[in-house]
Amino acid sequence: MASQAHSLSYSGCNFLRQRLVLSTLSGRPVKIRKIRARDDNPGLRDFEASFIRLLDKVTNGSRIEINQTGTTLYYQPGLLYGGSMEHDCSVLRGIGYYLESLLCLAPFMKHPLRIVLRGVTNDQVDPSVDVLKATALPLLKQFGIDGESFELKVVRRGMPPGGGGEVFFSCPVRKVLKPIQLIDPGKIKRIRGMAYSVRVSPQMANRIVDSARSILNKFIPDIYIYTDHMKGINSGKSPGFGLSLVAETTNGTFLSAELASNPQGQGAAMLPEDLGRNCARLLLEEIYRGGCVDSTNQSLALLLMTLGQQDVSKVLLGPLSPYTIEFLRHLKSFFQIMFKIETKPCGEELKGGDKVLMTCVGIGFSNLSKTLK
């Protein structure tokens, strides 16, 4: 058993998920102090406690110690076990908050993961399940994580503040990951989207589609935005509507943007026309930033490159988000790995923002739980 002396120490509540996920994969214990120590309501929030409970479910033999006020957390990771399970997520954050971390851990379980998550499927803070399905799953497939049992499905939609959504996620396990070379994003060839509405008029979704198309039609003809109006028990507990858009390039890169309406009873009411137009503009901004991986999945791509075989992996990204920059620092702490970062200024033929080429040699991470057959 690793003693607390070998553990990594951090302070503050920021990047809690990053630290716990990397701790689980590297096997290094982590101690986090001063979690909102000066706050009027100190310690871990409900959604963070729920995340720790989820980690406890998917691992076997984890040791978690939290002090009385919840301001200090000691986490000694166990083995990633997987299997079939259910988890009730906190409605304070979206299911995407939990799913992002499961996408990092799922390929390295002992048994294939099959999990039902309940809570908020679409909110204004976390990536929605629709966007993760359209962007993160194709990215995992590039690394060789694929198969019939690789699935992410929205069974019920749930909007904040009530939630009531349900998502099914299953992922096969892999012993090793393939190195990747994603250096040419290609040109945008089609845009797909999903306009959803729950517990409001189904006409809302159609109005969102019309306003989004009014902007996007100027650039490309191949646009199709589905409308999804769930009824009855499948519509969750709160009213709301929103839009997620995904642009696909000729080389199989996916760039996404999304917007959701204000939660019931919070903020001003939002017109579906405004939401559609703003979401279309966000997608154009994401396309301008560009790269082979969109800004939501930058850290997932870098993690899978780190854990790949001992071979060179390269990926071209748009400007790094602050979350990704901190993730690179954590990768250095937990895995002693550093990336070669080259800036690629936008040339004449490459319209859009400046790009960053990230290169690393994988650590040859092997799923020890997975026996060779």
Curated annotation (Swiss-Prot):
It comes from the Eukaryota. PROSITE patterns: RTC (PS01287). The keyword Nucleus applies. Keywords: Nucleus, Ribosome biogenesis. The keyword Transferase does not apply. GO terms for cellular component: nucleolus; small-subunit processome. InterPro entries: RNA3'-term_phos_cycl_insert, RNA3'_phos_cyclase_dom, RNA3'_phos_cyclase_dom_sf, RNA3'_term_phos_cyc, RNA3'_term_phos_cyc_type_2, RNA3'_term_phos_cycl-like_CS, RNA3'P_cycl/enolpyr_Trfase_a/b, RPTC_insert. One of its GO terms (molecular function) is RNA endonuclease activity. Coiled coil: none annotated. One of its GO terms (biological process) is endonucleolytic cleavage of tricistronic rRNA transcript (SSU-rRNA, 5.8S rRNA, LSU-rRNA). It is found in: Nucleus, Nucleolus. Part of the small subunit (SSU) processome, composed of more than 70 proteins and the RNA chaperone small nucleolar RNA (snoRNA) U3. Interacts with BMS1. Belongs to the RNA 3'-terminal cyclase family. Type 2 subfamily. As part of the small subunit (SSU) processome, it plays a role in 40S-ribosomal-subunit biogenesis in the early pre-rRNA processing steps at sites A0, A1 and A2 that are required for proper maturation of the 18S RNA. Activates BMS1 by promoting GDP/GTP exchange. Does not have cyclase activity. This is RNA 3'-terminal phosphate cyclase-like protein. The lineage of its organism: Eukaryota, Metazoa, Chordata, Craniata, Vertebrata. The gene is RCL1.
